[in-house]
Amino acid sequence: MKIAIAGTIGRMGKMLIEAVLNTADAQLVGALEHTSCPQLGEDAGAFLGKKTGVLISSDVAQVLANAQFLIDFTRPEGTMAHLAIAEKTGTKMIIGTTGLSADQIAGLKKVSANLAIVFAPNMSVGVNATFKLLEIAAKMLSQGYDIEIIEAHHKHKVDAPSGTALKMGEVIAEALGEKLDDVAVYAREGHTGERKEGSIGFAIIRGGDIVGDHTVLFAGDGERIEISHKSSSRQSYAQGSLRAARFLQNQKNGLFDMQDVLGLRK
């Protein structure tokens, strides 16, 4: 698999490069960064003390012309710019970027008519297993339980709630026959009155170097159930991304997520 990485100097980008270099069936062929990045022209493996022969570049078209896959954990505007060029070069995309708008997601869907894309708020196998557990729990606990989603991330994360927390909310809402937009409560302050029955609450924590913690609380009378996933490193995201690339090898076009990759789709 000939793979290019976007956001090379970021925490996730470095983890992805290391994972690709240590994977037998993967080859690093490109490393992308923005035009003002001070590391442009440096070897992509320099942070590991390795010479890969792949130089960090801002020339998206040139990089994607040599890549079968682009793994992109950047920001929405960057991802959409990469997508426009990937459509022309036929480079399949694995997108872990969060915070995309409804219009941007619609753009992904449009391009996927011609290009195979995996788009998921979290590439971790464990997180996606958690989504399945939440679907089951929500159906079983649909009456008499209040649902709250608590998420914590590092102080540098720019979007809130996290894409993973929102996906958890969507999974639960769908299991209950609702739309998340109709039942979500993202903030509480002051005299809020009693909790609205059937709502799904969110609480957000930002601080330190927390990789990603998510807990869903089902609170009933006399008992509560908590389903949690805690990430200790970004390695699980990198390995999930490579698994997504392998899945896309057999796809010509279409928009997929990790439920498809893992065979969990109904």
Swiss-Prot record:
Residues engaged in binding NAD(+): 7-12, 33, 96-98, 120-123
GO molecular function term, any single one: oxidoreductase activity, acting on CH or CH2 groups, NAD or NADP as acceptor
Annotated (S)-2,3,4,5-tetrahydrodipicolinate binding sites: 154, 163-164
Keyword check for Cell cycle: no
Reactions the enzyme catalyzes: (S)-2,3,4,5-tetrahydrodipicolinate + NAD(+) + H2O = (2S,4S)-4-hydroxy-2,3,4,5-tetrahydrodipicolinate + NADH + H(+); (S)-2,3,4,5-tetrahydrodipicolinate + NADP(+) + H2O = (2S,4S)-4-hydroxy-2,3,4,5-tetrahydrodipicolinate + NADPH + H(+)
EC number: 1.17.1.8
Keywords: Amino-acid biosynthesis, Cytoplasm, Diaminopimelate biosynthesis, Lysine biosynthesis, NAD, NADP, Oxidoreductase
GO CC aspect terms: cytosol
Pathway: Amino-acid biosynthesis; L-lysine biosynthesis via DAP pathway; (S)-tetrahydrodipicolinate from L-aspartate: step 4/4
Active site: 153 (proton donor/acceptor), 157 (proton donor)
Name the UniProt record assigns to this protein: 4-hydroxy-tetrahydrodipicolinate reductase
Species in which this protein is naturally found: Polynucleobacter necessarius subsp. necessarius (strain STIR1)
Lineage: Bacteria, Pseudomonadati, Pseudomonadota, Betaproteobacteria, Burkholderiales
Gene field: dapB
